[in-house]
Every structure is written in C-alpha cells, then in structure tokens.
Amino acid sequence: MFRNITLLLTFFALTSSLFAQSINFQPLSLEDAIIESGKTGKPVMFMAYQSTCTHCEKMINEVFPDTMVSNFYNANFINIRIDMLDQVMAKKYIQQFYLSSFPTFIIINGKAETLYQYVGEFKAAEFVKQAKLSLDPANQIPTNRRAFEANPADSTACYNYLLTLSRGRLATQSVASAYFNANNKQLEFTTSNWRILSMSVSNLDSEIFRYMLEHKADFEKVASTKKVERKFYLTAAYNLQTPATTNDTTNYFRYRNLAAKVGLPIIDSLILVTDLSVYEKNKQWDAYIQAAKSGAEKYLWNDANSLRRISDMIYEHSSDKSTLVKGANFAVRSAELKPEYFNNLSAAKIYFKLGYNDLSKKYAQQAIAEGKKKNMNTVEANKILEELGG
C-alpha cells in the first residue's frame, strides 16, 4: 500500500514538473547575456514585450509552457526578456531594434549582431519553426545583407534580404532605394520586381515611390489593379499615421499633400478622416467643418459613427444655418444607418438648435424609444422633449 502511495506521489510530482516547465528566462541584462553568448556560443533570444500586451501574455501563459517550445529554446538560446513599459529600457532599446509592436523576439550573437528578428503572437509549432530558421546562417540578417551588398542589382539577393528584414518589421526603404539605384533607376515590370517594391517601399516622398506611381499601369499588368492600389493606400496610411497621432502638423500636411497627388478615392477617403482628426485635435473648427462639408457625403456616407461625430462637432461649433442643416443631414443619415439612441439624439439636438421643432421632437422620441430598449439613460432626449412642450 505504501509503495502504491509513493508511486502515486511520484507520478503527481513528475506531472506537476512537466506542466510547470517553461522557457527559462535568465535574470540578465542584454549586455551581460551577450557576454555570456560570447563565452558559450549560444545566441541570445531577447524578448521585448509589454506587461499590458495581451499577445505577450498569451505567449507567456500558453505557448512558452509547451514542452516542445521550452525544450528547444532552453537548449539553444540564452533567453532574456525586458518589459518595454519600463521607460528607461524603452528609451534604450526601441530605437536600436526598431521596435514597433510587441512581442518582438530578437536573436543576437556574442558579437552583439542581430541575426534574426520576428514579431507577434505564434502557435507553438510556428514559434519553434522561427527559432530553427534563426539558427540557420542562410536565413540570418548578416548573411543576406552581405549577399545583397555584394550584388545590389540582383533581384534574388534583394528579395532574400528584404524577407529577413520584413520578419522583424525592420527598415526596408534604404534597401529598395539601393536596388533601384543599382539598376540605373529603370526596373523591369516583372512579378519579382513588384514583389520587391511592394514589401520595401514606405516613403511617399521618395524617388522610387514616384517611379511606382508613374508606372502604375505597367505594374498592374504583372500584379493587379487591386494589389497596386492597396500598396499605394498602405504607404499613404503609414506616412500619415505617425504625424497625425503625434500632432506633428508640419509633417502631416507635407505627407498629406503628397498622398493627395496619388489620386485614388481610397486614399482621398483616408485623407478626409485623418484631416478631421487633426483639425479636431487642434480645434481648427472652420477647417474641420469645411472638410466635412466637402467630403463626408462622398467618402463617409455609409459610416454611421463618423457622420454622427461630424454632426456633433457642427452642432457645438457652428451657428451658420446652412452648415447646421448640413450637419442635420449627417445626423439623420447616421440614424438611418444605425437607429440607435445617440444617433437619433444628434439629429434631435441639431434640429432643436435650428428651431425645427417638429423634427427635433421626432428624433428625440425615436432616441428615447431606442434608449429604453437597452435600458439607457435618456435624460438628454427627455430634456429636449420637455423644452418642446412634451
């Protein structure tokens, strides 16, 4: 009996140990880990993460405990992780490793060279696959950089180098420009060249982007109109997003004007939405209202939330009758698309400001009815009805 109990306890102990296993992250700084790598020959696996990142949390709690994952990473790497919510660490490493999203996994050798970089949330098998790829010199950044630098006009060398950089979301524009220059700024219109440009060009204000735009029809023949226009849209979005978010209006309007020259409706729609955000952030209400009046019907007519937002801004910041009428039209359209409480309330408010009492009453009543369906507080709509005499 005692022997059976002992065996049972041993089984539970082994099982607990198995489930508790995970990647063994060493309590080392990156600098000390690199020194250790130089001594042992094991590369460093540096995980840059944020403790509030859900993708990071999922990797830590669900992927790292996988036996296949932990066995491989513990056997082949010196593993460390650093929380980029620590502002000192963030300042030190974000620019150095071009960190733009988390988690990012960086493989570094004992000479402090970045060998490989990969980004995001992975399933266990794919995470091990990335680790195996990182250990093969043929897939490493230094190998592919040297091959490209030896023959910068070669499309295969360029593509392979870009592929290694793209895995880690590293900068690629300079590679595209070097390839373009090495080919005397005249690229053949081939699938391989489109693939290279599509994965590398990111600057609207670059000679190579202007070349792509000038030869849009030629590239559409080897790719497709949809793919080419999608690339132009993503490039515009990339260039507008950062200055708009940081409120760098000088660079925003510089890139905005370049984006407008592309002449694609999907980019014009993006420009309108971003313009409105920038104008609102800077309380430039005349510019906001003018942009909304000239573009909302064309680009946002099926976007209920945007139309309601515009209507609310017009209600708050305009007393011009024709502008208020326009704002009311946006609110009504919003309520048609989504007959929700706040959309109807927007229409009721702006009609009340215009003195169109019957219409204000109608939309206030509709707002109350929709609000009651969801047990919402309808006090604002009730107040409008009271002021209109019920």
Each predicted region: which residue ranges?
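Bacterial Sec-dependent N-terminal signal peptides
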Residues: 1-24
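Polar low-complexity intrinsically disordered regions
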Residues: 21-30, 39-40, 44, 88, ...
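Thiol-based oxidoreductase modules, predominantly thioredoxin-like and allied folds used
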Residues: 23-28, 66-89
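Local sequence-structure signature of Cys/Sec-based thiol-disulfide redox active-site neighborhoods
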Residues: 27-67
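Loop/turn elements at helix/coil->beta-strand transitions in domains of secreted/extracellular proteins
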Residues: 40-44, 75-78, 102, 110-113
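Solvent-exposed loop/turn segments at secondary-structure junctions
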Residues: 50-54, 84-88, 112-113, 121-124
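Non-catalytic, surface beta->alpha helical segment in thiol-disulfide oxidoreductase systems
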Residues: 100-140
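Oxidative protein folding and maturation machinery
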Residues: 148-390
